[in-house]
Amino acid sequence: MLYLAKMRNAEGELTENEQKIASFLLAHVSELKTVSSRNLAKQLEVSQSSIVKFAQKLGAKGFTELRMALIEEYSVNREKKHDTALHLHSTITSEDSLEVIARKLNREKMFALEETCSLMDFDRLKQVINLISKARLIQITGVGGSALVGRDLSFKLMKIGYRVACEVDTHVQATIAQALQEGDVQIAISYSGSKKEIVLCAEAARKQGATVIAITSLTDSPLRRLADYTLDTVSGETEWRSSSMSTRTAQNSVTDLLFVGMVQLNDVESLRMIERSSELINLLGRS
């Protein structure tokens, strides 16, 4: 959906406040990565709900979705105007210096972290932590970059005494999923929420009575619809991406939050196990 064109063509249909919002977004589209609905409401002296309703009027689910779409549109339009530079990743081009690349990557990652944190439903997160802490078995699924995030989480959870199954091979993931039981938990990590392998594993887990927790984007997807609980992640990457850099940053922020929350549930024993694990690893390093 071309939101930039929609805003330009909708002048006659907008209220005074909506026109104010549209004018700001059109004038500052290149700076939207650092703009939140709260800050925008304050700056324009309108209510935060007015901004959300404006986004929905254009066809977006909320301001975050509208802003991300505008950023992507702006990036694509700029690429068309400057097609001598090759897009390497997101807004990074072949003409950027290493210093510029570093700044762009940092901005992209900061955006992902801040937006993921601002969208977090902490009551839901607390429920999820309690569920995972009581699970007989925790399965973690993911492919590609999401699989790396899953492996990191599985290692951390095993350090504090949880039984975790996290296999990279998708055939093995499916085999584990179909053997889950009521009381087990599957943590499915997929930003798109539409990876066939992850969706099939989630379906199998649900069929067996296990609880499915999805770490995914805000976009409506098969995984999002299947999950009992969702933990939302936001990435500042556009379609021009060479790797899931800020996506992994957002996912890691959620999995790290899960881990620390679970350590907090049983802090003394968890810290004792982490210390024992470190001692053993140090002994291995000396051999």
UniProtKB/Swiss-Prot annotation:
Organism in which the protein naturally occurs: Citrobacter koseri (strain ATCC BAA-895 / CDC 4225-83 / SGSC4696)
CDD domains, A to Z: SIS_RpiR
HTH rpiR-type domain segment(s): 1-77
Protein name: HTH-type transcriptional regulator MurR
Any GO molecular function: carbohydrate derivative binding
Subunit structure: Homotetramer.
Gene Ontology biological-process entries: carbohydrate derivative metabolic process; N-acetylmuramic acid catabolic process; negative regulation of DNA-templated transcription; regulation of carbohydrate catabolic process
Gene3D superfamilies, sorted: Glucose-6-phosphate isomerase like protein, domain 1, Winged helix-like DNA-binding domain superfamily/Winged helix DNA-binding domain
Residue ranges of the annotated DNA-binding region, renumbered to this chain: 37-56
Record's function text: Represses the expression of the murPQ operon involved in the uptake and degradation of N-acetylmuramic acid (MurNAc). Binds to two adjacent inverted repeats within the operator region. MurNAc 6-phosphate, the substrate of MurQ, is the specific inducer that weakens binding of MurR to the operator.
Domain SIS: start-end pairs: 128-268
Pathway(s) annotated for this protein in UniProt: Amino-sugar metabolism; N-acetylmuramate degradation [regulation]
Keywords: Carbohydrate metabolism, DNA-binding, Repressor, Transcription, Transcription regulation
